[in-house]
């Protein structure tokens, strides 16, 4: 017998692990689509005029090779004890939370909870987060997270401008705020025409401002009561914002007790590693009357069809995707996964545990301050929580170096001071090393008391809801987390076919490095030489993304796709100003654009001019040409999505770019649909000047149930000098390098949520250039297969000139309205089959947009198709008069276990209602609640944990 080695490669990650359909299954799918090969399908789908010539050519790494490379890169980072503070602190992530939340795909692969019936677990966890924030800040309403503390401060400023009755156009910022917060506020204020006044609170003139931001405790440690300043602001009809620290509020008087209108901050030190800048969940809370002006997601309590308590996203008409160019915020993806971690940290420790941690941190700081004072050092401030500043004169460099020699980073403050911020991880050994750096080797025992006046001690209770006390034992904590995750539908259970969302595989090997200490524990403002591994990773990822997109430089700072849009538009405006063309402020945006596009343009101070869509869904070229000509020398940019939001490669994209350039504008190509382009089309080569990339879509960062995300922007060379900079680095950042000194930051950290960039880097390395291209091709195949199978049962809207869709397709459900069947009915019925609904009513009302990513197997796609075909038959029964829509399984969906076991009095069989075609029988997903009453929830708004007795609430 002759031995013949197999040609099967067990380590081929792209084809064996990431891409779902096998080669033989692809052949079957191609036959259904009506082509002989994948090459033919791509030729019929992607216009030849835009296809790239040069292939992506780097070789792939196997999983074990990837992890070995990651270990080598991680070793180049130097793990130090960072006592820099400035909004970032060492913290202990309880292993129960790391293993059961952060490393659990049931939590990290879920989508934003727009379908509440299949998101009750994470909605409860986010409601716990809101309750935690509301309790600790002393304000009644809190949102479910924002991107970072600096962004939250900027959002609070614009919120105050909307809500304030003051006629002033200036905003006061306490000079004791974190420098990165001040910088981001300046960035946000400038295009909106808001004057930013930075000064000491004693310099505040309330009549001159519409609002003020105070830091509590201050960036240099000061704890002070702002009650008097806040009262003066209110007298002048202005609003008061307090940037605060949740751990400090376990001891200190809460902002609400001072009269604050809005509180913001970061929940990072509640168990979320620093990660060289993120991701972390920022928070915002406010007075009740301001809740409708609050940006971000807001979880509320409602009831389902049986009157059972149910959670949902409340007041959604506030959000940018609905308000579009009238929006005042573009917040979309936030930081849900990190908010969930922080909420479980509070559940894990409870109010007593949190107070103990806060006391320990504070008393250690008192001991350190006393030891320094007794040795003759000049320590400030007099009132502090965890941060002190030491005057060291000309010895500053020596002290900083001595501390680093002992494995500790201190903060450089001015030219003659050193800042020290202690945290949960600080122990006696760390304190001894700090003192040793100051030449204090045998400190006298210190008497320990409060480091701030007793009048500043918190008097009110917090976290009194039983959820923060009943899970003390880890066994109960583990079961609680499991119960919540079992209520949700994430990628670990089924495909999530959301159009324009790209819910692809988030491979375990890609996720592993983010929890390694060499990556997780780095402070974003640590000396650059301590982050050589991060620098290498960021530069290499930037280089690969530039090769993929055809751009020349990449900024990794934006913390979300929407923030990337905003940063890209600011870059364009800065370019125009530098050329003496500051009058260019008009932005042309197709009416089918993502809702964040017009919202981002409005935030950048642009005037949005909406361009019509042609009947086939393309940009109406005649209308575009006319509006570009009308704008003339006022045209700043156009924003288009490619492939279009209608899921088609438009043939006229080069014409749109050419017309824009002829009138002196810049072309912004939204990268939300980049999953249909990687390896096939480079936006920078077809006329784009700038694009953002949704790394949480195309490049495998998980959605986390509503964040984290990353939205880096790629630009052509002429725009590179105008990329976002940062006060800690001194200039715009491109691929880990400073390229010039021009624009301010859009995020708190220089590289945004740096730790999750590792996921996209790992994805690119394991896929290789050929694998990335094949993933794009298979994504297009999967979408065309779905369209071909469903055509006839559903009308498929918008196809290219040769009858092909890109990576997603739009199903028209509007004809069913005559029979009384809504798109919502179809979405809820899919839950009975164990599926998340496709994107509903966007970009066309009354439609479903389906995106089956390349990671989905043919079997799973067929199961989804079976479900939709069965639903179509149920619609036909309604159309034929066999059953009324109100009595059909469509209207009663989703069906719960409670429905299954109750007396059955419905006009269809129990089997049909609860076990429709396509649904698993043994491992069936059962939604924990029936259809949620959205209107009830908004009429009876409750955004904190309801009392225990209300858990049996019944609809009135």
From Swiss-Prot:
The enzyme's E.C. designation:
1.4.4.2
GO BP annotations of the record are: glycine decarboxylation via glycine cleavage system
Give the N6-(pyridoxal phosphate)lysine positions (modified residues): 697
What are the entry keywords?
A: Oxidoreductase, Pyridoxal phosphate
Q: Which reaction does it catalyse?
A: N(6)-[(R)-lipoyl]-L-lysyl-[glycine-cleavage complex H protein] + glycine + H(+) = N(6)-[(R)-S(8)-aminomethyldihydrolipoyl]-L-lysyl-[glycine-cleavage complex H protein] + CO2
What Gene Ontology terms describe what this protein does at the molecular function level? glycine binding; glycine dehydrogenase (decarboxylating) activity; pyridoxal phosphate binding
Q: What class of enzyme is it?
A: oxidoreductase
Q: Which GO terms describe its cellular component?
A: cytosol; glycine cleavage complex
Which cofactors does it use? pyridoxal 5'-phosphate
Entries under InterPro entries matching the protein:
GcvP, GDC-P_C, GDC-P_N, GDC_P, PyrdxlP-dep_Trfase, PyrdxlP-dep_Trfase_major, PyrdxlP-dep_Trfase_small
Please describe what this protein does.
Answer: The glycine cleavage system catalyzes the degradation of glycine. The P protein binds the alpha-amino group of glycine through its pyridoxal phosphate cofactor; CO(2) is released and the remaining methylamine moiety is then transferred to the lipoamide cofactor of the H protein.
| Protein family membership | Belongs to the GcvP family.
Q: How does it assemble?
A: The glycine cleavage system is composed of four proteins: P, T, L and H.
Q: Which HAMAP family match?
A: GcvP (MF_00711)
The protein here is known as Glycine dehydrogenase (decarboxylating)
The organism of origin for this protein: Cereibacter sphaeroides (strain ATCC 17025 / ATH 2.4.3)
Q: What gene is behind this protein?
A: gcvP
């Amino acid at each position: 017998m002759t031995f013949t080695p197999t040609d099967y490669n067990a380590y081929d990650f792209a084809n064996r692990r990431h891409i779902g359909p096998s080669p033989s299954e692809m052949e079957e799918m191609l036959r259904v689509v009506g082509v002989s090969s994948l090459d033919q399908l791509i030729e019929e789908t992607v216009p030849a005029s835009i296809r790239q010539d040069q292939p992506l050519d780097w070789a792939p790494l196997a999983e074990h090779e990837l992890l070995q490379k990651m270990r080598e890169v991680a070793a180049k980072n130097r793990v130090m004890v960072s006592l820099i503070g400035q909004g970032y602190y060492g913290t202990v992530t309880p292993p129960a939370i790391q293993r059961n939340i952060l490393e659990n795909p049931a939590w990290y692969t879920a989508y934003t909870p727009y379908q509440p019936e299949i998101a009750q677990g994470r909605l409860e966890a986010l409601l716990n987060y809101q309750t935690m924030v509301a309790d600790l800040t002393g304000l009644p309403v809190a949102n479910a997270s924002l991107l970072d503390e600096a962004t939250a401060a900027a959002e609070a400023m614009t919120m105050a401008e909307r809500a304030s009755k003051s006629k002033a156009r200036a905003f006061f910022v306490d000079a004791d705020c974190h420098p990165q917060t001040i910088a981001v506020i300046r960035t946000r204020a400038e295009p909106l025409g808001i004057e930013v006044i930075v000064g000491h609170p004693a310099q505040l003139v309330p009549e001159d401002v519409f609002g003020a931001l105070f830091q509590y405790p201050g960036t240099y440690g000061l704890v002070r009561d702002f009650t008097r300043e806040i009262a003066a602001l209110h007298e002048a009809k202005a609003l008061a914002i307090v940037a605060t620290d949740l751990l400090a509020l376990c001891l200190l008087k809460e902002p609400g007790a001072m009269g604050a209108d809005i509180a913001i901050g970061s929940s990072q030190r509640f168990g979320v590693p620093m990660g060289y800048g993120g991701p972390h969940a920022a928070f915002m809370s406010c007075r009740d009357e301001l809740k409708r002006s609050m940006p971000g997601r807001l979880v509320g309590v409602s009831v389902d069809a049986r009157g059972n308590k149910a959670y949902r996203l409340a007041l959604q008409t506030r959000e940018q995707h609905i308000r579009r160019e009238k929006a005042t915020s573009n917040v979309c993806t936030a930081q849900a996964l990190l908010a969930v971690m922080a909420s479980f940290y509070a559940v894990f420790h409870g109010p007593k545990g949190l107070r103990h941690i806060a006391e320990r941190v504070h008393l250690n700081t008192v001991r350190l301050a006393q030891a320094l004072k007794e040795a003759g050092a000049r320590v400030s401030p007099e009132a502090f929580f965890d941060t002190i500043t030491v005057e060291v004169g000309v010895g500053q460099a020596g002290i900083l170096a001595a501390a680093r020699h002992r494995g500790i980073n201190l903060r450089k403050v001015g030219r003659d001071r050193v800042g020290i911020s202690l945290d949960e991880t600080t122990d006696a050994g760390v304190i001894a090393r700090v003192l040793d750096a100051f030449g204090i080797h045998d400190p006298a025992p210190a008497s320990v008391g409060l480091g701030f006046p007793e009048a500043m001690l918190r008097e009110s209770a917090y976290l009194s809801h039983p959820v923060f006390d009943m899970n003390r034992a880890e066994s109960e904590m583990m079961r609680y987390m499991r119960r919540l995750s079992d209520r949700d539908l994430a990628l670990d259970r089924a495909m999530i076919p959301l159009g324009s969302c790209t819910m692809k595989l988030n491979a375990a090997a890609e996720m592993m490095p983010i929890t390694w200490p060499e990556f997780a524990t780095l402070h974003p403002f640590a000396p650059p030489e301590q982050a050589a591994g991060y620098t290498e990773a960021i530069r290499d990822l930037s280089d690969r993304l530039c090769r993929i997109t055809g751009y020349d430089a990449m900024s990794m700072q934006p913390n979300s796709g929407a923030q990337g849009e905003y940063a890209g538009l600011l870059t364009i405006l800065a370019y125009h100003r530098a050329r003496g063309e500051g009058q260019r402020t008009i932005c042309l945006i197709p009416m089918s654009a993502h809702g964040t596009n017009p919202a981002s343009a409005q935030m950048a101070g642009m005037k949005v001019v909406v361009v019509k869509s042609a009947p086939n869904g393309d940009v109406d070229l005649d209308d575009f040409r006319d509006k570009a000509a009308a704008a003339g020398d006022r045209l700043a940019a156009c924003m288009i999505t490619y492939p279009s939001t209608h899921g088609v490669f438009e043939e006229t994209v080069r014409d749109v770019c050419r017309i824009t350039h002829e009138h002196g504008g810049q072309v912004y190509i939204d990268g939300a649909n980049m999953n249909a382009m990687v390896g096939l089309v480079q936006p920078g080569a077809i006329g784009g000047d700038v694009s953002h990339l949704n790394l949480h879509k195309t490049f495998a960062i998980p959605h986390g149930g509503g964040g984290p995300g990353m939205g880096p922007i790629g630009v052509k060379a002429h725009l590179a000098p105008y990329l976002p900079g940062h006060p800690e680095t001194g200039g715009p950042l491109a691929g880990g390098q400073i390229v010039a000194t021009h624009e301010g930051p859009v995020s708190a950290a220089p590289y945004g949520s740096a730790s999750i960039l590792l996921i996209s880097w790992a994805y690119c390395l394991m896929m290789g250039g050929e694998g990335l291209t094949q993933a794009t091709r298979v994504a297009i195949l999967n979408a065309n297969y779905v369209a071909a199978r469903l055509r006839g049962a559903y009308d498929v809207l918008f196809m290219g000139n040769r009858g092909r869709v890109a990576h997603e397709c739009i199903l028209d459900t509007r004809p069913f309205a005559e029979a009384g069947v809504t798109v919502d009915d179809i979405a809820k019925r899919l839950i009975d089959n164990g599926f998340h609904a496709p994107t509903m009513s966007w970009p066309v009302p009354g439609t479903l947009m389906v995106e089956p990513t390349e990671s989905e197997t043919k079997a799973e796609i067929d199961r989804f198709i079976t479900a939709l075909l069965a639903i179509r038959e149920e619609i036909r029964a309604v159309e034929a008069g066999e059953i009324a829509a109100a009595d059909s399984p469509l209207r009663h969906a989703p069906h719960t276990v409670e429905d299954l076991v109750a007396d059955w009095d419905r006009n269809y069989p129990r089997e049909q209602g609860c076990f429709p075609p396509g649904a698993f029988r043994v491992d069936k997903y059962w939604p924990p609640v029936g259809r949620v009453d959205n209107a009830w929830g908004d009429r009876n708004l409750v955004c904190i944990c309801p009392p225990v007795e209300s858990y049996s609430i019944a609809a009135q």
